Amino acid sequence: EEQRKIQSNILTTHGMKANKLINAWVAFVVACVQMLSDNGKIAFVLPAEILQVAYAEDLRLYLSNHLQKITLITFEELVFPNIEQEVVVFIGEKGGEEKGIRIFEMNNLDDFDTLDLSQNGFKKLQHVKEKWTKYFVSAKEMELINTIKTDKRFTRFSDYGLINVGITTGNNNYFSVTDEVCEMYDLEDVTLPLIGRSSHLHGVYFTSQDWDENRKGGKRARLIYFPDTPLEQYSEKHKEYIKLGEDSGEDKGYKCSIRDRWYIVPSVWVPDAFFLRRNNLYPKFVLNRCNAVSTDTTHRIKFYEGVDPELVLISYYNSISFAFTEICGRSYGGGVLEILPGEVGNIMLPKIQDLPPEKKNDIINRIDNIVRNNLDIELALDIGDQTIIDLLGIDSSWCKQCRKIWRKLQHRRLKRS
């Protein structure tokens, strides 16, 4: 506890937020940089989290403000396989004119034999809290990304609706059930259609047919949502299921134990759409067509009044927006792309504001067919790219460059799988 106080003091003294989520290495780096001489250099082996996690955003800003040169050396292979954590070599320099940041990507430690630090130029470092993963793209590509951010033909995903985490049940195994369990305890009238895993989503619509397929396949496709009424009013079968949970200790988990009534799941509402939190090739964005809900494996989206969900859907499946999913998200481990609600909100979408119904349906049906049948997603991106080129006059070279950015960042991430 004393050590935590010292760490907090180091962070707050330098204008940074302190909380229990911040690892000790963050404060250690700040303290060391603060002690550097005017022309000093410093080097660390750090968790690769420094590049992207939210709790290190204050650190990224601090380092960009206090160092003239930052060099990062990353590795495609795990350097310390026993700890299964990605690391980077961080080199910071004070003094002289500001040069910015540069990144060297290496396969493994053997590449140090041929490393030439003079062969990689610095990029201008933006003094913001944004992720440093964006510096894996070239200066020309970064210029395009920044241009898109200020182009009036684009807007942030968050401008279309509220993006929230899925339902935290506290115990998915207990609260998400199969048809068999539902029938056994007569739970039909206290369950909602559920998306419990990424594999439950098939196309860009989640329909009653999709839900039926999941149920008949024996998946936990129902969420138990007991009403906030006195327990005495519950049926005997429902009381029996609650007693079953208590006998097996399901009520003792932290999330359940802090509720007034452990078996009533909070914050249950039906969203307009879903966005996958953790993804392999790309994040699926799916419209809700059967009043389903989701666990926290999937984010929930409630569109603002007047927003056409289908136009937002079309505006997502293109090379530019896909490039932003990789820029805004983070590599979670094993090559998985994790993207949190605030990061989804920062994805740039082209403003498709008007489209004849038959044209809109044709585009969505073609994209849905590609996604639903696990065809190459680039076929869907081709459709989306041509749509925004035709409707908004987007330069085709922008789509080509962003497709290249998406492939590059996706490939880098997947090489860790």
Residue ranges and their predicted role:
Residues 353-394, 398, 402-406:
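Extended amphipathic alpha-helical segments enriched in small hydrophobics
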Residues 411-417:
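Non-globular, low-complexity intrinsically disordered regions
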Residues 88-93, 107-108, 271, 320-325, ...:
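A general structural signal for short secondary-structure boundary/capping elements
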Residues 59, 238, 312, 383-384, ...:
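Generic structural signal for hydrophobic residues
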Residues 141-357, 361-365, 369:
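Polybasic, glycine- and aromatic-enriched phosphate-binding surface used to engage nucleic acids
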Residues 1-170:
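Signature of N6-adenine DNA methyltransferases within the class I
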Residues 73-77, 329-335, 378-382:
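A generic structural motif
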Residues 24, 186, 190-191, 379-383:
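Residue-level detector of well-ordered alpha-helical segments, enriched
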